[in-house]
Structures are given as C-alpha cells and as structure tokens.
C-alpha cells in the first residue's frame, strides 16, 4: 500500500494506457507525469480505440499525444480539468500537428506553461505543464467567479526562472521557490 492506498488497481494486471481498463470512468481532475517521448507503445489493437476517435491515431513513434488523448478521454465532459507534464517537443512535433489543431479547435487547451530546464533529477530538458479544461465558460466554480475563457489559451514561459540552483549529487538542479510558484499561480488565476 502507498500511504494507505490499496495496491489492487483492477481485475487485470495490465497497462491501462494500452488496454484502457477504466472505460466509462470520468474524473473532475487528473494530474499526470507520463513518461516523456515513450517509444514502442503502439499495438495494432489500438487502431480503432475510442480514445482517438475525435482526434486521429497518435503516431506510433511517440506516445505523448496518446497520453494526452487518454487523459482527455477520462475527464468529466462537463467540467473536467487536467494538468500534466510533457517534454517541450510535444508543442511542435510535426507528426501530431493535426491532433494539436483539433485540441485547440475543440477548445480543450487552457494553458501551456514552459518550465525551466534542470527541474528533474533524471533529465536536464525543459518540460511543459499542459492544462486541459472541458469547460472554459465563465461562471461560478468552487466559490470563485471565472470569466469566459473560451477560445483563449494562456501561455507562460518560465524558462528564465533559474535563480534557485541546488547542487545535486552529480548535477546542478533548479528549484522553484514558494514565491515563484505563488506568482505563477496568481498569473494563472488572474487570467
């Protein structure tokens, strides 16, 4: 058990990514840090998978957009929100241009936040925090009044926020401090 959570995650010991074990389950919020640029993920059985039906089949060479569509397929259609990290290459990969266009045309992308390099222990690349939102209309939401954000996307580039260098075992790493995080959150909420 992890912090009191049962290890039983379903009737089958299988990957819910390549064999969706949670069809019909929808969530208010999803947070994820999927493997960046995963290769070898594709299986011929996925060709007709419902998760791609509105967007097209993600490229076999890289699972980034398969993860995006997997996450989107499990958000509550009325008001689900997701936040997840992907390698920056997902923003301009030519093989995923049509899927990216449809995500924007369908008004699913709320924010793209490019983070500084060297935040992760395992890689030095800069990554992007994506925020998807099923409902960008204004109104009351959890005690807050939100303005209508339909057909708008917030872009934040935090790559220059590199002041807080921390020496690791073998490499220098960057850590965002509480004031930087609060500033980014304030920009997002004010927008």
Language-model features, listed with the residues they occupy:
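A conserved structural/catalytic subdomain of Rossmann-like adenosyl-cofactor enzymes
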Residues: 23-191
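S-adenosyl-L-methionine
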Residues: 1-25
């Amino acid at each position: 058990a992890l912090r009191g959570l049962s290890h039983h995650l379903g009737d089958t010991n299988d990957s819910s990514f390549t064999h969706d074990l949670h069809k019909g389950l929808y969530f208010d919020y999803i947070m994820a840090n999927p493997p960046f640029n995963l290769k070898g993920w594709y299986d011929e059985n996925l060709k007709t998978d419902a998760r791609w039906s509105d967007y097209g089949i993600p490229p076999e060479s890289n699972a980034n957009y398969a993860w995006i569509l997997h996450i989107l397929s499990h958000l509550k259609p009325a008001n689900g929100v997701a936040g997840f990290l992907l390698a920056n290459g997902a923003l301009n990969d030519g093989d995923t241009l049509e899927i990216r266009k449809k995500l924007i045309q369908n008004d699913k992308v709320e924010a793209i936040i490019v983070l500084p390099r060297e935040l992760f222990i395992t890689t030095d690349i800069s990554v992007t925090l994506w925020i998807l939102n099923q409902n960008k209309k204004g109104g009351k939401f959890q005690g807050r009044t939100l303005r209508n954000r339909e057909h708008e996307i917030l872009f934040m580039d935090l790559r220059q926020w590199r002041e807080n260098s921390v020496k690791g075992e073998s490499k220098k790493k960057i850590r965002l401090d509480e004031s930087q995080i609060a500033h980014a959150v304030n920009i997002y909420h004010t927008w």
